Design a protein with these regions (language model features):
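Basic/aromatic-enriched alpha-helical hairpins
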Residues: 29-113
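N-terminal DNA-binding recognition helix of tyrosine site-specific recombinases/integrases
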Residues: 83-86, 92-103, 111-145, 197
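Basic, Lys/Arg- and aromatic-enriched nucleic-acid-binding interface segment
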Residues: 143-199, 203
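Conserved tyrosine-mediated DNA breakage-rejoining catalytic core shared by Y-recombinases
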Residues: 148-149, 204-246
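Catalytic-site neighborhood detector that most strongly recognizes the C-terminal catalytic loop/helix
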Residues: 162, 219-223, 263-264, 324-349
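Active-site/catalytic core of tyrosine-dependent DNA strand-transfer enzymes
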Residues: 168, 237-294
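Short, basic (Lys/Arg/His-rich) helix/loop patches that form interaction surfaces
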Residues: 178, 282-322
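Short, polar N-cap/turn motifs at the start of nucleic acid-interacting alpha helices
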Residues: 209-214, 294-296, 315-334
Length: 357
């Protein structure tokens, strides 16, 4: 009898050891596969696994991103966690996250005033954490709530933010006598001309990135998500050079082109300066848009307009995709204002025979 009890106890111990081994192995393989393995990162990941709550897994992910210097992603995960805790509290069990729970969560976010695109971002980050938990064996396949026939994240179509070439010309000529308006207008125009560059990449440009009359850079947004570094090259047209001459630092090889960063910032302060500049550009450009009767103009508008102006001019979508640094054409298609009102009106007019009043 005692021997049988010992045998059962040994079997249970072996199962625990095997389970722990599989969790550690899965964590190591996942981190190594993403190029982010370190003992600290492994420790953070295993802390999340040991706690067995969604909240703790989020906090482990946030700590992992902070140590990797990925402040933008860290802040997004932190924001998503706050929303989750407003909805379901500070100890969310993995088995509580069901299809019906996700529907209620999406409804809750909608009632908070979030648009579909933002709701989709929250749900995708929750799904990413559950994917980590699934790889670690914490969430069984039968428990996993996302996917075909389960909960499918509804994607927002995306706002059509593109301006016409005529509107961009009016922005370029706009003056109100304010130096701040002139500077932020020029920064916005530089974003547009520089392949719709994101502000996070704009602030990090240095004079050494200009090679043979082209600016060369790798998008910060994709440098951690792709195995091959995709370099974007932008011809420095005279209008861009004029903006550099007007607002840039002295043209020394290691200097930042624009006086936003000074090179002493840690990742968090770099992110904060980027966010501050983005807000400043958006605030000033919103005022410009109102004065010109164009509507709201933002840094996103610059990126969308770059893509759409090229498309209207007949540029190949593959070229536009490469210029934006996208990994697939579908992302680019989302950027393009394919169904603008003017295009719909033109196509509708084709249906009307001559002489039909």
């Amino acid at each position: 009898m005692l021997g049988a009890t010992k045998a059962r106890a040994l079997v249970a111990v072996r199962k625990d050891i095997e389970s722990s081994y599989q969790i550690v192995r899965a964590a190591v393989e996942d981190l190594a596969g993403n190029g982010g393995f370190s003992l600290d990162a492994l420790n953070d990941r295993l802390k999340g696994a040991a706690s067995n709550t969604v909240n703790a897994m989020f906090r482990a992910k946030i700590a992992e991103l902070e140590k990797a210097g990925r402040v933008g992603s860290m802040l997004v995960y932190d924001n998503v966690l706050k929303g989750l805790e407003r909805f379901a509290g500070e100890r969310i069990q993995f088995d509580a996250v069901t299809v019906s729970w996700l529907k209620r969560y999406a409804d809750f976010l909608g009632k908070e005033g979030k648009v579909q695109t933002t709701i989709s971002i929250h749900l995708r980050h929750l799904r990413a954490v559950l994917n980590d938990a699934r790889r670690l064996g914490i969430v069984k396949e039968t428990q996993y709530p996302f996917g075909r026939g389960r909960y499918e994240i509804q994607e927002g179509e995306g706002r059509k933010l593109a301006l016409t070439l005529e509107q961009i010309g009016r922005i370029a000529r706009y003056e109100d006598g304010s130096e701040a308006t002139a500077k932020y207008r020029d920064y916005w125009l530089f974003l547009y001309l520089c392949n719709g560059i994101n502000v996070a990449d704009f602030v990090k440009l240095r004079y050494r990135d200009i090679v043979d009359g082209e600016i060369c850079f790798v998008r910060q947004k994709t440098e951690h998500t792709t195995k091959t570094r995709k370099e974007i090259r932008v011809v420095v047209v005279p209008q861009m050079q004029a903006i550099i001459d007007r607002w840039g630092n002295p043209p020394v090889r290691n200097n930042f082109i624009f006086p936003v960063l000074d090179g002493t910032e840690d990742a968090i302060h770099q992110k904060l300066k980027t966010m501050y500049l983005t807000r400043a550009i958006n605030k000033r450009m919103q005022e410009v848009g109102e004065q010109l009767g164009i509507g709201n103009i933002s840094t996103y508008t610059a990126r969308h307009s770059f893509a759409t102006v090229l498309k209207r001019a007949g540029a190949n979508i593959a070229y536009i995709s490469e210029s934006l640094g996208h990994q697939d054409l579908k992302t680019t298609e989302n950027y393009l204002a394919s169904f603008e009102r003017e295009e719909r009106e033109k196509n509708a007019a084709i249906l009307i025979p001559d002489g039909w009043k």
